[in-house]
C-alpha cells in the first residue's frame, strides 16, 4: 500500500492487514495452508487472523519468535534487507517504541527462541505445525 502511495500510519496499517486477511481467508476456504509473517503487536491485529480462521472454519496457530538478546536483536535489525524500498527498515528506536506498546497475548500461542540457529528455529516451527 505504501508502494502505491498511501501514507504511512495506523489507518494504512489496518488496511494492509485487512487486505492480507482477505487473501488469507480466501486461501483457507480453499483448504490451503497460509503463513502470515506479521508483528501482531495488538489484540486487534491478532483478531484479524482469528477472524480469517473462523470464517474458514480453520484453526489458527500463532508462533511468536522471541529474541531477548538486545545486542543480537540490534545486529539483525541493522543487517536486515527485505528489498522493499517503499517500506524502509525500522530504526532501533522504532522497534523499542513498538515493544513498549506491545499488548499482552490473550489466547494460546507458541513461543520460539529466535536466538537459536536458523536450522533449530525451523525445526522447532515445523515440529509445532505438524
Task: Describe each region flagged by the PLM.
Residues 124-130:
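C-terminal alpha-helix
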Residues 37-45:
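Acidic, metal-coordinating catalytic cores used for nucleic-acid/nucleotide bond scission
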Residues 33-35:
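Residue-level preference for the first positions of well-ordered beta-strands
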Residues 56-77, 112:
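Conserved phosphate-donor/acceptor-positioning beta-strand/loop module used by diverse small-molecule
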Residues 25-29, 53-58, 102-104:
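Conserved catalytic network of the ASCE P-loop NTPase/AAA+ motor domain
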Residues 1-30:
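Conserved substrate/cofactor phosphate-moiety recognition/catalytic segment
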Residues 44-60:
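Short, electropositive alpha-helical surface patch
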Residues 79-124:
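Small-molecule kinase domains that catalyze NTP-dependent phosphoryl transfer to phosphate-bearing small molecules
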Amino acid at each position: 500500500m505504501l508502494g502505491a502511495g498511501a501514507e504511512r500510519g495506523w489507518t494504512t496499517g489496518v488496511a494492509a492487514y485487512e487486505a492480507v486477511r482477505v487473501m488469507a481467508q480466501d486461501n483457507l476456504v480453499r483448504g490451503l495452508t497460509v503463513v502470515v509473517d506479521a508483528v501482531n503487536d495488538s489484540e486487534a491485529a491478532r483478531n484479524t487472523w482469528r477472524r480469517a480462521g473462523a470464517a474458514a472454519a480453520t484453526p489458527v496457530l500463532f508462533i511468536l519468535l522471541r529474541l531477548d538478546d538486545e545486542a543480537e536483536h540490534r545486529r539483525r535489525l541493522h543487517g536486515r534487507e527485505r528489498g522493499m524500498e517503499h517500506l524502509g527498515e525500522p530504526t532501533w528506536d522504532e522497534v523499542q517504541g513498538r515493544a513498549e506498546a506491545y499488548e499482552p497475548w490473550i489466547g494460546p500461542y507458541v513461543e520460539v527462541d529466535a536466538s537459536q540457529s536458523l536450522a533449530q528455529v525451523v525445526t522447532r516451527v515445523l515440529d509445532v505445525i505438524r
